[in-house]
Amino acid sequence: MSEDEAAQAPGPSLSEQDQQSAVQRVAALPLIRATCTAVSEAYSAAKDRHPLLGSACRLAEHCVCDLTTRALDHAQPLLSHLQPQLATVNDLACRGLDKLEEKLPFLQQPSETVVTSAKGVVASSVTGMVGLARQGRRWSVELKRSVSHAMDVVLEKSEELVDHFLPMTEEELAALAAEAEGPEVGSVEEQRKHQGYFVRLGSLSTRLRHLAYEHSLGKLRQKKHHAQDTLAQLQETLELIHRMQCGVTPITPARPGKVHELWEDWSQRPLENGRRRHSQAELETLVLSRNLMRELQSTVDALETSVRGLPPSAQEKVAEVRRSVDALQAAFADARRFGDLPAAVLAEGRGSMARAHACVDELLELVVQAMPLPWLVGPFAPILVERPEPPPDLEALVDEVIGGPDPRWAHLDWPAQQRAWQAQHGEGTVLSGNIPEEEPEPPSRPKHTLMPELDF
């Protein structure tokens, strides 16, 4: 065809130019063109390497071309009818392509440039991640060193506190001395330094539980001895009253108590009008008996609180002691002389005191043989009771924190405070009418608030 004929030949319509322009723009994108070229080269190379595959591919190409031609022939009337809609879609596609090229500039760049940029970004990211990993490793090493030092300090301080507040028992000291006699045995501190944290923590926990258990048993034994001493004095008082009612001279025991001392002091007093006043001695004896009962009742209260988490059998032992004390206290409440106490009441009281003495022995034996108890080996809060309001005697229970001891004896320890109180109140005053004033109650021992279940 000559140039004139080509110039006179009818050209494509505007919509066809727009449609061809949209398709051409998509196909002309460097990234799309490079991808299509790579796929075409791989397809051609595969056909050349495998003759059978090449024949099959050429047959498939021929079939696809025929099908496409026939489909276009049948769809041509429909495409001509939808020409305005296709033009609109083509226009929208061109606008979307413009926006896409603005947002993704690399679509207009050659594939080599895109790959090079991607490699640079990946390399920069990897370098940054490697730097962060190295920095994190340095931080982890520093953190590990700090945690290691902190754990050493905490464990050393914990061991010092345990040694201070719960010192070693005689058995542990003997075992430590036996180990020290062996060859090349380091000190306890040196051995602790060579142990791991979990080993030291486990041994500290086991030792703390053992020492707390021994400390609690020691407190319970002290309460047991105190209760049995008070029970023995009450038993002695009941026996003396019984003998006096029968007209028998009391026998002084090997270890005379307060009642026998009172009667000996009374017997050495000068006569009044040729006789001694028995009523005065009887009244003082009854007052002393009531004081012993109140002291025993406070001891039973402490025992009852300490066995709250024990099995019912142990709680029943303390309850039996309380019933005996309450019954005896009710019998002595209105007595003004020995004649007000029936012989049956005295006999029953002596029997109940003997049973209470046995119950206290059985209680300690039950605690020692039955178990290490949860409230002894930890946790150190066996029973938490929610109360709607603070108890009325809260200040007395936490006097070590919010109350404080008597300011006169604040600088003294507990045994010295007891001696000071006894020196001040050793001689009770006598009221008018020959009725002695009741002896003021001695100061109670401050109760610790950090581990109250260890104070029975």
UniProtKB/Swiss-Prot annotation:
GO terms, biological process: lipid droplet organization; lipid storage; negative regulation of fatty acid beta-oxidation; negative regulation of lipase activity; negative regulation of peroxisome proliferator activated receptor signaling pathway; negative regulation of reactive oxygen species metabolic process; negative regulation of triglyceride catabolic process; positive regulation of fatty acid beta-oxidation
From the UniProt entry, list the residue stretches annotated as the region Interaction with LIPE: 1-108
Q: For the region Recruits mitochondria at the lipid droplet surface, give the residue spans.
A: 438-456
Compartments (UniProt record): Lipid droplet; Cytoplasm; Mitochondrion
Keyword hit for tRNA processing = no
Q: Is the Mitochondrion keyword given for this protein? A: yes
Homology family: Belongs to the perilipin family.
Q: How does it assemble?
A: Homooligomer. Interacts with PNPLA2; prevents interaction of PNPLA2 with ABHD5. Interacts with ABHD5; targets ABHD5 to lipid droplets and promotes interaction of ABHD5 with PNPLA2. Interacts with LIPE.
The protein in question is named: Perilipin-5
- This protein's species is Ovis aries
In the UniProt record, what gene is named as encoding this protein?
Answer: Plin5
